[in-house]
């Protein structure tokens, strides 16, 4: 508070970025083995701002039926064709992938929770990533309920299963501090595009420095 103040009173791209914001983004990226990370006020905002900038009417999004409400709402905001499969039903996921390809989808993204919060079930990421490779699809995982304690170093369900996914979203409001904040981690090109087009990022005040500093300390403890 004494060195960085109470709040930023601004969005990130005007005067809402301090060194510690970028430090946290880089630390999260390294922790999750991604190129870069973009911070949001909450993971609900992260999921709400993810799909619309990346997917257009020529693309397809395939979602697990029990995904978190924020994924469902984020998908509603984008123009991609929508497909759904029953919770963890890999046969139906493959059917939907085949249908999306048959319908001429340019890009296909599979969206899933890493851990389904109501039941505690883990997504079958080994099979999801296998099918994604088979049908040339991207994989997005919301890992709010796994980051910080699952996997060899607490990096979540992909680390737990030893697989790689294209995009991860998560929260600073559970194991990584327990207050507020969310993020998207992924390839540099994806994060660069989101910084220009993700509306919750562009039009929401930056995370308070105290939250950022506490999250950095939480990462220290986890690591």
Tell where the protein language model's regions lie, with residue ranges.
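Conserved N-terminal alpha-helix of the aminotransferase class I/II PLP-enzyme fold
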Residues: 3-43
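Hydrophobic beta-strand scaffold residues
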Residues: 8, 61, 82, 139-140
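Conserved PLP-anchoring active-site segment centered on the Schiff-base-forming lysine
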Residues: 50-69
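Active-site phosphate-binding strand-loop segment of PLP-dependent enzymes
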Residues: 83, 87-141
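Active-site C-terminal subdomain of aminotransferase-like
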Residues: 108, 135-138, 145, 150-223
């Amino acid at each position: 508070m004494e060195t960085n103040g109470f709040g930023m009173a601004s969005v990130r791209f005007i005067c809402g970025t301090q060194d510690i914001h970028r430090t946290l983004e880089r630390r999260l990226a390294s922790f999750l083995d991604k190129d870069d990370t973009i911070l949001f006020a909450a993971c609900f905002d992260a999921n709400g701002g993810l799909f619309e900038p990346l997917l257009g009417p020529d693309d397809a999004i395939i979602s697990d039926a029990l995904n978190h409400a924020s994924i469902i709402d984020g998908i509603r905001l984008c123009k991609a064709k929508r497909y759904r499969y029953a919770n963890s039903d890999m046969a139906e996921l493959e059917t939907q992938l085949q249908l999306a390809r048959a319908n001429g989808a340019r890009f296909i993204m599979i969206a899933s929770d890493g851990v389904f919060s109501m039941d505690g079930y883990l997504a079958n990421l080994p099979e999801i990533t296998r099918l994604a490779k088979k049908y040339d699809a991207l994989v997005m995982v919301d890992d709010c309920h796994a980051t910080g304690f699952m996997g060899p170093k607490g990096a979540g369900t992909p680390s737990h299963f030893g697989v790689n996914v294209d995009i991860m979203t998560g929260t600073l409001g559970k194991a990584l501090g327990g207050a507020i904040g969310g993020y998207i981690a992924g390839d540099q090109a994806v994060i660069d595009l989101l910084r220009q087009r993700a509306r919750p990022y562009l039009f929401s005040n930056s995370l308070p420095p105290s939250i950022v500093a506490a999250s950095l300390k939480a990462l220290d403890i986890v690591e």
